[in-house]
From Swiss-Prot:
Reactions catalysed according to its record: iminosuccinate + dihydroxyacetone phosphate = quinolinate + phosphate + 2 H2O + H(+)
GO cellular component terms attached to this protein's record: cytosol
Keywords assigned by UniProt, alphabetized: 4Fe-4S, Cytoplasm, Iron, Iron-sulfur, Metal-binding, Pyridine nucleotide biosynthesis, Transferase
GO molecular function, one term: quinolinate synthetase A activity
Name of this protein: Quinolinate synthase
GO BP term, pick one: 'de novo' NAD biosynthetic process from L-aspartate
Pfam families: NadA
């Protein structure tokens, strides 16, 4: 029997916070990026969790702001020869797997993800080997090497539907790496799921007691929760879903005040969707506790204006994403299954 890697004992060294830019410096880099995007025939693909000024720039230049599933779709279909991926490393890898003919640039190749870090490929392969009768489903937040071992890749926006489908076929599942999302999906579908025990450092920090106190302070507020959060937080929610699903819920819920339990980067697009509603951050630290991420992924914060300009200007090994071709071809199989399945859901 394999010994499972224990993410709870792993130490994830946080990157240094980017040096703040002055107003003039921000204006300089914004104009430089706009010029370089045109010169490089490039387009920005940014995740909801990047800083607001990055999302705004993606909007202004005809790029994409979305969850990881739509980032993958957009980048593959866009005619630009270069994709500037503002996010974390697995997103850049996914873009390269789906668009091998394109140049994939990232502001930094050191933008990690705690879910990815918490699922080392050697330990995961041993875990899968110990359960050969199970279908392997991995979250998009994993390395290309882990995706190679998967039968399916999935994002949070279609996780419940996919596992419900596989369960209807009588398949038993290995789910990796997020234990909270896996538990949520199991509860929603009743599927036979064996979970890897990873967690997102942002969502894992939401505190039940502190959220209860905030709810008591604002009893008229609805609570929106990403399913990467602990079960006790999910149980308090008026709406549970992926980033795009939470934005949709913000529009449909009648409440004028919303408590949001996910990375605060989502507030940029959510506030656009509901300009007349008040958005409150769910607390990440209770009494006597401190937060590490404080509701914002430290690696997402590495996607600054200066780093984006340098990526477009310098290209090369410090910014370009490469995936071994044999690895890419194998990882493409479960990714394409995900995209094909998602297309059937859209009808």
């Amino acid at each position: 029997m394999s010994v499972m890697f224990d993410p709870d004992t792993a130490i994830y060294p946080f990157p240094p916070k980017p040096t703040p830019l002055s107003i003039d410096e921000k204006a300089y880099y914004r104009e430089k990026i706009k010029r370089l995007l045109k010169e490089r025939n490039a387009v920005m693909v940014a995740h909801y969790y990047t800083d607001p000024e990055i999302q705004q720039l993606a909007e202004e230049t005809g790029g994409c702001i979305s969850d990881s599933l739509e980032m993958a779709r957009f980048g593959a279909k866009h005619p630009a020869s270069t994709l500037l991926v503002a996010g974390v490393r697995f997103m850049g890898e996914t873009a390269k797997i789906l668009s091998p003919e394109k140049t994939i640039l990232m502001p930094t190749l050191q933008a990690e993800c705690s879910l990815d870090l918490g699922c080392p490929v050697e330990e995961f392969n041993a875990f899968c080997d110990a359960h050969p009768d199970r279908t392997v489903v991995v979250y998009a937040n994993t390395s290309a090497a882990v995706k190679v071992r998967a039968d399916w890749v999935v994002t949070s926006s279609i996780a419940v539907e996919l596992i419900d489908h596989l369960d209807s076929l009588g398949e038993k599942i290995i789910w990796a790496p997020d234990k909270h999302l896996g538990r949520y999906v199991q509860k929603q579908t009743g599927g036979d799921i064996l979970c890897w025990q990873g967690a997102c450092i942002v969502h894992d920090e939401f505190k039940t007691q502190a959220l209860t106190r905030l709810q008591e302070e604002y009893p008229d507020a609805a609570i929106l929760v990403h399913p990467e959060s602990p079960q006790a937080i999910v149980d308090m929610a008026d709406a549970v879903g992926s980033t795009s699903q939470l934005i949709a819920a913000a529009k449909t819920l009648p409440h004028q005040r919303l408590i949001v339990a996910t990375d605060r980067g989502i507030f940029y697009k959510m506030q656009q969707a509901v300009p007349d509603k008040e958005l409150l951050e769910a607390p990440t630290a209770g009494e006597g506790a401190t937060c590490r991420s404080c509701a914002h992924c430290p690696w997402m914060a590495m996607n600054g204006l200066q780093a984006i300009a340098e990526a477009l200007e310098q290209e090369g090994s410090n910014h370009e994403v490469h995936v071994d071709e044999r690895l890419r071809e194998r990882a493409l199989v479960p990714l394409n299954r995900m995209l094909d399945f998602a297309a059937t859901l859209r009808g």
